[in-house]
Amino acid sequence: VHDDLPSNLCYDWEIGVKDEVDAIFDKADHVTKLDLINNRLVANPIEPRAALAEYDPAGDHYTLHTTSQNPHVIRLLMGAFVLSIPEHKLRVVAPDVGGGFGTKIYHYAEEAILTWASKKVRRPIKWTADRSDSFMTDAQGRDHVTTGELALDKDGHFLGLRVMTNANMGGYLSTFAPAIPTYLYATLLAGLYKTP
């Protein structure tokens, strides 16, 4: 995608102390290994994304009603990076969001364009995605290829996890894309099991 870069590796991220984990695995009574492929997916909520933006010239204030799962971050990003206004000049309301499956947590161009345009035309502007819009523009779950290893003692207690994941980030990063296969993923791998 980017000809000026030497490879398509976006970043290499680690959590934990590799030498300590390797030592735990060397002493483990049992090590089990799993290769896992998580396919790319498209969330498909019944309720598509939608937004209504309105500018109030009297108070120099915007209101955005949007089907966002994360209205506070939308307000932060739009205030700081899109409209260049203080956060208190933008109210973001997320009423009945409907289904989302994570795809409505991102900041989308439609929200920014509607909000900006509402000031230009001095009228409220609304938009609702149709199914084709959703398939083409909603953030998708990127595929991951993972090798996971679990070190156990003789009684089956977890001693440690060692995981290597290659995550397809796509050509361009979305709002939360870097966090999903790294911090959000790695810190949840053990689930509810006691793992040192």
Model-predicted regions and their roles:
Residues 1-196:
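Structural alpha/beta core scaffold segments of enzyme domains
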